[in-house]
Amino acid sequence: MDTSLKNNDGALDADNKNYQDYKDEPDKTSDVLDVTKYNSMVDCCHKNYSTFTSEWYINERKYNDVPEGPKKADVHRCTII
């Protein structure tokens, strides 16, 4: 079970920023996904993209339908610690 986002505003803020970056520059999706790896201290593990915050789906219901967007594949799930 992924509890990394519960009671962790830092991780949620990072995800929201990454999502906004994705919307602004959809051709740089891989760069956006890499951003959280460069926080000063992070705890990373592989998670399916579908486990990311529900806010992403609320803000952009067709996010997963974007052809250039990330597929439901393993990416880094990083939490600021």
Curated annotation (Swiss-Prot):
Q: Which UniProt keywords apply?
A: Early protein, Host cytoplasm, Host-virus interaction
Look up the record and report any one GO term of the cellular component aspect. Answer: host cell cytoplasm
Principal subcellular localisation of the protein: host cell
Similarity-based family = Belongs to the asfivirus L83L family.
Q: Where, subcellularly, is it found? A: Host cytoplasm
Spans traversing the lipid bilayer: none
Q: What is this protein called?
A: Protein L83L
Domain of life per record: Viruses
Q: What does this protein do?
A: May subvert the host innate immune response by interacting with host IL1B and interfering with its function.
Indicate, by first and last residue, each region the UniProt record lists as having compositional bias (Basic and acidic residues): 14-28
Expression is induced as follows:
Expressed in the early phase of the viral replicative cycle.
- Residue segments, region Disordered: 1-28
Oligomeric state and partners? Answer: Interacts with host IL1B.
Is Lipoprotein among the key words of this record? no
Source organism per UniProt: African swine fever virus (isolate Tick/South Africa/Pretoriuskop Pr4/1996)
